[in-house]
A protein has these predicted regions:
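Hydrophobic alpha-helical targeting segments used for export or membrane insertion
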Residues: 1-12, 378, 382-390
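Hydrophobic alpha-helix feature that most strongly marks membrane-spanning transmembrane helices
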Residues: 330, 334, 346-349, 353, ...
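Signature aromatic-anchored transmembrane alpha helix within multi-pass, membrane-resident enzymes
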Residues: 305, 358-386
Length: 500
């Protein structure tokens, strides 16, 4: 209980003072709000338009958070913090279940304090839910294999007693249900633990293990759970969820670069193949400083024929390495590349590093180094989370315009924007305005403001005098300067408001 509470508090630090970052965070947050407004929890919408990029589990979690805390930046991010804390608890429980509680503590700390976890545990996106269910699937898949192997003559774990059918069924259900919920979090990549389990069986050449997976029944269970949402979603969207969600955002993303993230040519694709093997040293920081040591340690043990440390002859190292390799290979081959795509491998990597690092403390002073790195990272993380967000909030243009104009906003207002259409505009202003954002060009902006009823438009400040040279005295304007993170450029915006 103490561990889980501390993890949640660590991840939540600063989430209330940093505005949502364009573009993904406001899209998720607003789509969840529109689920509530539309009373439709099957098909997500953003700004009254279908949003078919991701399955619904992250939206459902945010909806639950909104019900508890209300709609805010904090409540949009709260589910990710919970998911990240649960991942650490799963790693801890996995290790403790295998008789190594101290390794579990180390692994949970390593995962929690890695840079990519620090970022995404505070982000209003779906990634941490994917990581959670993939980690659960990897753990339960491992338990299925290791416990099933007690019926064979080789690789029989010495730590375990007789297998109870109840336990075997529990791990079987956990494995296939985790695959289902992982899919509902972020799509087919959640099924990669199937590849890990399959590859482990092939490498072990123990074909009797495959029988205990009950693969056909398990896949049917997974598909049945997904179908409870998927069939209504396909019916409501006339198949668009499959065409866009899988066709565009899975298949096309794998074959071609999307949104400028990745290679623009085949030559660049080849050049970027080592992308994740380089970015891991940033994403997994500060623990990446020990990765070269871990590689040398694994190589020495393989050459010496030393069995896995701590767990007898259960080959956990091989299982963890297989899972890590599969995730890295999949995303290495995918054309679209972002540093956080390999985040599902981090729990496995944290457990692998903790097993060997903690084991080495018996003959070295590495334990002292671990404590120093952990304490320093935790203190720096808290300082950054609590100090930086309030200092940079003024550079978020949509957030600042909303704060300044909030007393003048009315629920029945219409609103539009010219040349600044970031999702944060929709998220912040729709918390006070019931209508949806209209995207207009310079010519239509004047016509829009000439319409009946209260309304406002957001335009670049350089266009204000051209578009509205002689505004009525009853009109109000608000100006802000900031930084468009999505496009990487500075902006100077003015909100022109007509109250009646």
């Amino acid at each position: 209980m103490f561990l889980s509470f501390g993890l949640v508090l660590f991840h939540l630090a600063g989430t209330w003072s940093l505005p949502l970052i364009d573009r993904d965070e406001p899209r998720f947050a607003e789509a969840s709000r529109e689920m509530i407004q539309r009373a439709d929890y099957v098909v997500p919408y953003f700004n009254n338009q279908l949003r078919l990029d991701k399955p619904p589990l992250a939206y459902w979690a945010q909806v639950a958070s909104y019900r508890i805390f209300g709609e805010s930046d904090f409540s949009a991010r709260f589910p990710s913090a919970i998911a990240a804390a649960l991942v650490a608890l799963v790693i801890f429980a996995w290790s403790r279940c295998n008789g190594a509680t101290s390794v579990g503590w180390w692994a949970a700390i390593i995962f929690t304090l890695s840079l990519q976890t620090f970022v995404h545990a505070k982000a209003a996106v779906a990634d941490m839910w994917l990581v959670l269910f993939m980690t659960l699937a990897h753990w339960s898949g491992y338990e299925l294999l290791s416990r099933s192997s007690r019926g064979t003559a080789r690789q029989m774990p010495v730590r375990l007693g007789p297998v109870k059918p109840y336990h075997q069924t529990r791990w079987w259900l956990t494995f296939y249900l985790s695959l289902a919920f992982g899919f509902l979090a972020k799509g087919p990549i959640a099924w990669s633990p199937l590849l890990t389990v399959g590859a482990t069986i092939i490498l072990a050449r123990d074909w009797q293990l495959a029988r205990h997976l009950k693969l056909l029944r398990g896949i049917l269970l997974t598909l049945a759970v997904v179908a409870l949402w998927g069939i209504p979603a396909l019916v409501q969207t006339h198949g668009l969820f499959l065409a866009i969600g899988i066709g565009r955002h899975v298949i096309s993303r794998s074959l071609v670069t999307m949104e400028g993230h990745g290679a623009s040519s085949f030559g660049m694709y080849l050049l970027l193949l080592p992308f994740y093997f380089v970015t891991i040293f940033v994403s997994f920081f500060p623990w990446s400083i020990k990765l070269p040591w871990l590689i040398r340690q694994l190589c020495r043990q393989k050459k010496a024929g030393i069995a896995d440390p701590g767990y007898g002859r259960n080959q956990l190292d091989n299982y963890l390495l297989t899972g890590i390799a599969i995730i890295f290979v999949i995303f290495t081959l995918v054309a679209t590349k972002l540093p956080h795509y390999t985040l599902p491998a981090f729990p496995l990597l944290a457990l692998l590093l903790a097993r060997h690092w903690q084991g080495a403390t018996a003959i070295t002073n590495h334990g002292s180094l671990f404590r120093k790195v952990a304490i320093t990272s935790a203190c720096l993380g808290l300082a950054i989370a609590l100090i930086i967000p309030p200092a940079v909030a003024r550079f978020f243009p949509a957030y600042q315009l909303f704060r300044e104009s909030r007393p003048n906003l009315q629920p029945n207002m219409q609103f539009a924007s010219v040349e600044f259409e970031e999702p944060s505009v929709v998220w912040y202003f729709r918390s006070r305005v019931q209508s949806f954002l209209n995207r207009v060009n310079k010519k239509n902006a004047v016509d829009f403001m000439s319409g009946p009823g209260p309304r406002f438009v957001i335009v670049p400040t350089s266009l204000v005098q051209t578009l509205f040279p002689n505004p009525p005295q009853t009109w109000t304007s608000f100006r802000t300067r900031g930084f468009n993170i999505a496009k990487g450029n500075q902006v100077d915006l003015t909100l022109v408001l007509k109250s009646e």
